[in-house]
A protein has these predicted regions:
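A carboxyl-terminal module marker
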Residues: 2, 450-457, 467, 543, ...
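Mobile "lid/hinge" segments at catalytic clefts and subdomain interfaces of large enzymes
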Residues: 125-134, 138-140, 149-154, 168, ...
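Terminal amphipathic helices with adjacent charged low-complexity linkers/tails
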Residues: 203-229, 407-435, 442
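Conserved mixed alpha/beta core segments that line enzyme active sites in large multi-domain catalysts
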Residues: 48-78, 257, 268, 274-346
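Short, hydrophobic beta-strand segments
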Residues: 3-9, 174-183, 236-244, 378-385, ...
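Extended, well-folded interaction surfaces typified by the phenylalanyl-tRNA synthetase beta subunit core
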Residues: 428-594, 737, 790-792, 802-823
């Protein structure tokens, strides 16, 4: 949005105000000005001159000698190579000492590149030249914005241009233009009237809005045209008027200048008037050739499946059912609503009657269509931010008035107006004290009311209680904090004293759920795992690749209506799909080892489609592959195995104070049935872990052994023991023994440890499996398992004899289970 200060000055009294100071104040008060542009910057001393005569240069065929009247006593002589000059033409002249811009640069603010060129008098092939005549480009003017002027050679000005006047007085080159950086919530400021109201409120200046009236003539529009809304949720208001006896031509210079200040190219008086009203009032309009609209009827509806339209740019567009269109009486799309008109109903030089549209469309719908079609415009941008329905009638009457004043059209009697649900003014109730407390000042109520009324709020006050009616054009306000912000910014943020916020310091604490999650995370990180964060979405196709059988509860996933990607159409019911994608990505990047985990919510609906909020709970899952050891350390190259993952899970339970759990074979389908386990307590599975099933690895294209785990947090919550265990530092030394056992292959480690602990007595302090072997040197049907046993007494030093007795007792107990010492 650009704001011409010349134009703004016709709406609000800003005479004598410094443009730079004004821009700074607007920015501080929440209406940010990105750049202050001076279109004529770089042009100095360039005046208009009339060519009196043109002669050929005696020594150069490509040069011409021109005598010009520049408003001085004597004509001046300028030598030029331009071939388009003739006697009687008015041209811009840069005489000696004048400055012209170095170049035009569309990427620079205002299109002007820094630096200029100073003109000096001189000689061309022996003939004196007092300066130069200028082309459009040499004045730094964007040729695209001046379609009526010649773009080649010297700029030829209109015949009625006075002689000897500064070029700044033409085409508003003496204007100052603000390039605004408005936030999307301030949709009201995307118009000159909105900016005038805001400027008047901030600077306490009088605002004079245009007086709008229409001189209606001829037969009424009813019965000759109609407008309809098929879905009121997507079109809040639809106004229509009929212009007759239209004369297509150029717009007045002042309208063209104001359009150019916003970078809009003048086209013809009808299109220019529509663009002008959009800039002035903020309501986009669309014009149709009345005689080309079938049935003279316009209907706002959603596009049909497979429907197409040729837009004004000549491109055929494929529409989809989410796009809004304006259809004619034959139900054919005549316009992509709020985005671009149709080619078949375009206003041309032959147009005699124009059907006007002033409508308010759904912001989200216009945004989707605009992005999908790649069509962004001033109109679609305004619709995306929100349009006030009350401005529709004002805008359509304004364009009629402008064209009537130009003698370019007459307006048929009456206005078509479909307005299904009229907008009601928003009322906010609050108090002076609440607003003051929110801002942190003590403003008198009279001053507060004055500020609100300057912003066009209607205020009723009684004993400090305020009933505030929000103006219809402020769509961004909804409650007391918004009112407080309005008061604060107009009062001036710089006037609010800086204070240090006060608050009582209270001891913070985590909830039990937070504490459990923190402890699990801390334990996993301490064991060398890295936390990852994936999307809360998944694709149910990945569940099959994880070996989950059809009918498993993880398939009961909530579909997402508007997924961010086709790869994530469902809410996740397990963390494993996201982790598997992370793991495969790491493998593709040649990362040969990784230990990762994720914590997060999963979503389990009771039924689909949803009738109530789904069950949402926390899980932990992780995956490990490669070597846990860093290069240069002992055991370098050792790969993760089942006992690593088991130890990690045991450490988690230890961190939570959970004891007396059982270990069972896992039935979790993701894991290898023979190399996996569950920790179970009170009939609840606390965690499942093990090596990933070979079928899973094959489906994901992984050729390494991968170990994983799933921790069911809800099952743990009521088992966490907050008791802090304390044991004294031992006074007496321990005695250690190693047992190398020949164990039947069907025996589990858990069964062996249970026998040893029962036989070992109360002085057996620790028991640790440190070696497991099956191979050629071990009897068939058996495996070798080696344990380290630590014995200690609290009241004395144990003798070797005592320890040997317990070892004999343990060996006898093991023998009953066919477990013997290795020879």
């Amino acid at each position: 949005m650009n704001v011409s200060l010349k134009w703004l000055g016709t709406l609000v009294d800003i005479k004598g105000m410094n443009p730079d100071d004004m821009a700074e104040t607007l920015t501080v008060d929440g209406i940010p000005v990105e750049h202050v542009i001076r279109p004529g910057e770089g042009i100095k001393g360039v005046i208009t001159g009339k060519i009196l005569s043109v002669e050929k240069h005696p020594d150069a065929d490509h040069l011409l000698i021109c005598q010009l009247d520049v408003g001085e006593e004597e004509p001046v002589q300028i030598v030029t190579s331009a071939s388009n000059v003739k006697a009687g033409q008015i041209v811009p002249c840069a005489l000696s000492g004048a400055h012209v811009p170095a170049a035009h640069d569309n990427k620079a603010p205002g299109g002007l590149r820094h630096g200029d060129i100073k003109i000096k008098a001189g000689k061309l092939r022996g003939v004196k030249s007092a300066g130069m005549m200028c082309s459009l480009g040499e004045l730094g003017m964007d040729a695209n914005l001046f379609p009526a002027l010649n773009h080649e050679g010297i700029l030829i000005l209109p015949e009625d241009t006075p002689v000897g006047v500064d070029i700044h007085n033409l085409y508003d080159l003496d204007d100052v233009v603000y390039e605004m950086e408005l936030t999307a919530n301030r949709a009201d400021c995307f118009s000159m009237i909105g900016m005038a109201l805001e400027t008047g409120a901030i600077f306490r200046k009088k605002v004079t809005l245009p007086s709008i009236s229409v001189k209606e003539e001829g037969a009424p529009i009813e019965g000759r045209a109609s407008v309809h809304i098929s879905e009121p949720a997507y079109c809040k208001r639809f106004c229509g008027r009929l212009l007759e006896n239209v004369k297509i031509g150029r717009s007045p210079e002042w309208i063209e200048d104001r359009l150019r200040s916003n970078g809009i190219r003048p086209i013809n008086n009808v299109v220019d008037a529509a663009n002008y009203v959009m800039l002035e009032i903020g309501q986009p309009l669309h014009t149709y050739d009345y005689d080309k609209v079938a049935g003279h009827s316009l209907t706002c509806r959603h596009a049909h499946e497979g429907e197409k339209i040729v837009t004004l740019d000549g491109q055929e567009r494929q529409l989809n059912p989410s796009d809004l269109v304006i259809a004619d009486g034959d139900d054919k799309a005549a316009c992509v609503a709020g985005v671009m008109g149709g080619f078949d109903s375009e206003v041309t030089a032959e147009t005699k009657n124009v059907l006007l549209e002033s409508a308010v469309f759904d912001s989200a719908s216009i945004r989707r269509t605009s992005r999908r079609l790649g069509l962004r415009s001033e109109a679609s941008g305004r619709y995306e931010k929100g349009i006030n329905p009350a401005r529709s009638e004002m805008a359509i009457n304004r364009i009629c008035q402008l064209l009537e004043e130009q003698g370019a059209a007459t307006t048929a009697k009456g206005m078509l107006d479909e307005y299904p649900v009229k907008a009601k003014p928003q009322i906010i109730k609050t108090t002076v004290k609440r607003i003051n407390d929110y801002i942190g000042i003590n403003m008198p109520k009279e001053q507060m009311i004055e500020i609100l009324e300057a912003l066009y709020f209607k205020v009723e006050e009684q004993d400090g209680n305020l009933t505030v009616t929000v103006p219809e054009f402020r769509l961004d306000l909804s409650g007391m904090p918004d009112l407080a912000e309005e008061v604060a910014r107009v009062y001036g943020y710089k006037n609010i004293p800086i204070t240090t916020p006060w608050s009582a310091i209270a001891k913070g604490a985590m909830s039990k759920d937070q504490d459990v999650i923190f402890r699990i995370t801390d334990s996993l990180v301490a064991d060398g795992l890295s936390e990852v964060v994936n999307y809360s979405f998944m694709d149910k196709k990945d569940l099959e690749k994880l070996n989950f059988p059809w009918g498993h509860k993880v398939y009961n996933a909530i579909p997402i209506m508007n997924p961010i990607s086709e790869e994530y159409p469902d809410m996740r019911t397990t963390l494993l799909p996201g982790l598997m994608h992370t793991l495969t990505y790491n493998l593709s990047q040649k990362n040969e080892e990784a230990a990762i985990f994720e914590s997060g919510h999963v979503y389990q609906p009771k039924e689909l489609p949803l009738t109530e909020l789904p069950y949402e709970y926390e899980l932990f899952s992780g995956l490990l592959y490669g070597s846990p050891d860093e290069a240069g350390y002992p055991n370098n190259g050792r790969k993760y195995d089942f006992f690593d993952i088991k130890a990690i899970m045991e450490n988690v339970l230890k961190a939570l104070g959970i004891r007396d759990y059982e270990i069972r074979r896992s039935t979790y389908p993701v894991f290898h049935p023979g190399i996996s386990a569950d920790f179970v307590k009170d009939g609840k599975t606390l965690m499942s872990f093990g090596q990933l099933h070979p079928a899973v690895l094959d489906k994901w294209g992984i050729k390494k052994e991968v170990y994983g785990f799933v921790i069911f947090v809800p099952h743990l919550m009521n088992m966490v023991d907050e008791t802090i265990d304390y044991s004294r530092i031992p006074k007496f030394p321990a005695s250690q023994r190693d047992l190398s056992l020949l164990v039947p292959a069907h025996c589990t480690n858990d069964e062996v440890e249970e026998i040893i602990r029962k036989a070992g007595g109360k002085h057996l302090e620790t028991l640790r499996l440190f070696d497991l072997y099956q191979g050629e040197q071990v009897k068939e049907g058996c495996k070798s398992m080696a344990y380290n046993l630590t014995f200690r007494a609290e009241d004395r030093t144990l003798t070797d004899k005592e320890v040997d007795q317990w070892i004999e007792k343990i060996v006898k107990a093991l023998g009953k289970a066919d477990i013997t010492l290795r020879a």
